[in-house]
Regions:
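Compact integral membrane and secretory-pathway proteins
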Residues: 1-172
Length: 172
């Protein structure tokens, strides 16, 4: 069972791309930074003025990583399986994990940033990560709604049974 890109539908492609965006934003983009007069002072002292998600969200990072892995597993399973059973199950996991991650990130990015609110602010990575988690949840839902057998995996001809007699036998 090799991976066939033709088995992927739009929701799985979107989930895979959003998972990669979330993963990259976790490590490469600043999620939180100092605001106000502290940022220039910290920069002059050689202190980093921003942190990525991996270093600033000690518990949430595991949920985010699990969401990324589930979305990538959905892409892999959809591309390698002829039957929709496993991809359908993973669509549910991706939908639920993406939704839970989005809710947690809404809280951590928009409502309660780590650290004092008058000192720490959310940066671009936090908003990109939040958007990516919302997209993953939506793609998981759309993938679940579109479940079925791909046209190339469908049976070519459905066998039918022909009866020559139209009479019904009566018991004697």
């Amino acid at each position: 069972m090799g991976f066939q890109r033709t088995r992927l539908r739009r929701p799985e492609i979107v989930a895979g791309v959003a998972a990669v965006v979330l993963l990259l934003s976790m490590f490469l983009l600043p999620w939180y930074g100092y605001k106000g007069d502290l940022a220039p002072l910290a920069a002059r002292l050689g202190v980093s003025t921003s942190q990525d998600a991996w270093h600033s969200l000690s518990t949430t990072r595991w949920l985010m990583l699990l969401t990324v892995l589930a979305a990538l597993a959905l892409v892999y399973l959809q591309g390698t399986r002829r039957s929709p059973a496993l991809p359908a199950a993973f669509s549910v996991f991706v939908w639920l994990l993406g939704g839970l991650t989005a809710l947690v990130l809404i809280y951590r990015v928009l409502i309660n940033v780590p650290g004092p609110n008058n000192v720490v602010t959310s940066d671009v990575g936090a908003y990109i990560g939040l958007l990516a988690s919302i997209v993953i949840a939506g793609a998981g839902y759309r993938s679940l709604r579109a479940e079925g057998i791909a046209p190339q995996d469908a049976p070519k001809e459905i066998p039918t049974v022909h009866f020559d007699q139209t009479e019904v036998a009566t018991p004697s």
